[in-house]
UniProtKB/Swiss-Prot annotation:
GO terms for biological process: division septum assembly. NCBIfam families: GTPase_YsxC. This is Probable GTP-binding protein EngB. It comes from the Bacteria. HAMAP family: GTPase_EngB (MF_00321). GTP binds at residues 30-37, 57-61, 75-78, 142-145, 174-176. Keywords: Cell cycle, Cell division, GTP-binding, Magnesium, Metal-binding, Nucleotide-binding, Septation. Mg(2+) binds at residues 37, 59. Belongs to the TRAFAC class TrmE-Era-EngA-EngB-Septin-like GTPase superfamily. EngB GTPase family.
Amino acid sequence: MKVTKADIVISAVKPEQYPDSDLPEIALAGRSNVGKSSFINKILNRKKLVRISSKPGKTQTLNFFLINEMMHFVDVPGYGYAKVSKTERAAWGRMIETYFTTRTQLDAAVLVVDLRHQPTKDDIMMYDFLKHYEIPTIIIATKADKIPKGKWQKHLKVVKETLAVEIGDEIVLFSSETGLGKEEAWKAIHKMTKTKNA
């Protein structure tokens, strides 16, 4: 998809702050510093739309981006950062649970994982959470450029088996450096939005 317009609309922490819109929404989740911001910037053809932080756990709000006046991307705060206090972690949990369980505009989620490593307990928990609430999920296995091409399938198998990926959920090999998987990611996103609104 050709992105001609991408703007941040609002940073929200509670439902009354969410955009008053019927446009489909795609939530983007992932561990702190997994490369989620780089993924968003790459797929939207923007270098600095989403700030890439060297400090894990920096995003503490749901950031809504309006794409081509057609849909919203919702950047969810990164999880799994050990130095976040229990109070902050609990607040984060409540915020995302409220969004995922009440937002009718939500069509699907994108879960960004690092292809180089086995998904963590937090990755598994996040995927299970999405499945518990029956949210269609696209898994973006990023940093593919850091692994020899001949080992991609082996690493994909580990991701698939560790998360126990359900039938219907797609896994897309991705690289923010080379742009690998960009078209496939957009195809998967369109499929999810069309499927739900068909």
